[in-house]
Amino acid sequence: MKSEIIAVGTEILTGQIVNTNSQFLSEKFAELGIDVYFQTAVGDNEERLLSVLKIAKERSDLIVLCGGLGPTEDDLTKQTLAKFLKRELVFDKTAQERLDEFFASRPTSMRTPNNECQAQIIAGSQPLSNKTGLAVGGLLEADGVTYVVLPGPPSELKPMVNKELLPYLSKTSEKLYSRVLRFFGIGESHLVTLLHDLIAEQTDPTIAPYAKTGEVTIRLSTKAHRQKEADSKLDKLEKKIITIDNLADYFYGYGEENSLPQVVFDLLKEKGKTITAAESLTAGLFQARLADFAGASDIFKGGFITYSIEEKARMLGIPFEDLQLHGVVSAFTAEKMAERSRQLTQADLAISLTGVAGPDSLEGQPAGTVFIGLSSSKRTMAIKVLIGGRSRSDVRYIAVLHAFNLVRQTLLSHKNLV
């Protein structure tokens, strides 16, 4: 289980107080075998806390927020988390009774609407009672992630953790297991639409989609006593997902840290194939990604960056008049770039990328138009990809992903194309 601790409070960032809560929680979690992967401090600001929660949700299974439960205007933790999860705040009866007792015993103390907020929890939460203060804590699960809300003062947090949170975590013999499925070539909204029925009916396991630049991931999460039990439940759900329409065509791998370039690199090594590339608009990004992996020299000997029309003719030997006739942004040029780079390096496969990164059009082609060529000893072909409404850097980045995906599809094809 990946856990993350978020300390909320501007006074932590300004150095007015030392964040001892995170150290205390990390120590206690370690005793339970819960790994703390991240610690974050954020000020009392809704927008910044929302951004931190968005990041935490994508990388952690257990998120613990400390602080921001008090009666002042800048105590926004519960309200912000409720907004993030699209849930309402509701009153906890026990916490309300504690408020009543507190002010009944102090008739001179003024009870304000802000005090009432201390007795609220997020709908669906399990309350964590506060024996040394007024702000109730809470624990809830949403989209495969467990959220815990704790008060900031150590005199309140420590008893709540020791008496409420730790017993809950330790007595829960079931652990949270997750599996990440990675998809390329399909948008998040389209994927969510296809999975609508499964998402609407989800209980355990749960399905949580995440959009990334150029791709989408789905985290499947379940609770189980052991890995084998979890795998059985996750296998069944994964099979349901992959068999919906043509989702299997977009699925390329597993894992939080995996990537399309990594999958292609592993496939090339597994099949003993070599690859080269000739790049125009991406200016070497495809080749750079290959070189990121140890052992790249086994499958990649070198390639070409032919940014201008002159270099396409000079380095690759493509007749200049042919390039002028067909244009550099064309299927013809993409095919010739791939074919010539393969012939010159004697690689098994060659990829080429030529197109319009933007923001201006080129040769009548709008920004985001990309032609990707692929050449093997069996055939040479090109595909056209439209990556509209993106920044120049995004167009180049996504174009490289499309190139890797084309290689992946070719290597996995049953038509013996390599």
Curated annotation (Swiss-Prot):
SMART domains noted in UniProt: MoCF_biosynth
Transmembrane regions listed in the UniProt entry: none
Alphabetized Pfam families for the sequence: CinA (PF02464), CinA_KH (PF18146), MoCF_biosynth (PF00994)
Cited CDD domains: cinA
Family membership noted in the UniProt record: Belongs to the CinA family.
HAMAP family in UniProt: CinA_B
Name of the protein in its database record: Putative competence-damage inducible protein
Organism whose genome encodes this protein: Streptococcus mutans serotype c (strain ATCC 700610 / UA159)
Gene from which this protein is expressed: cinA
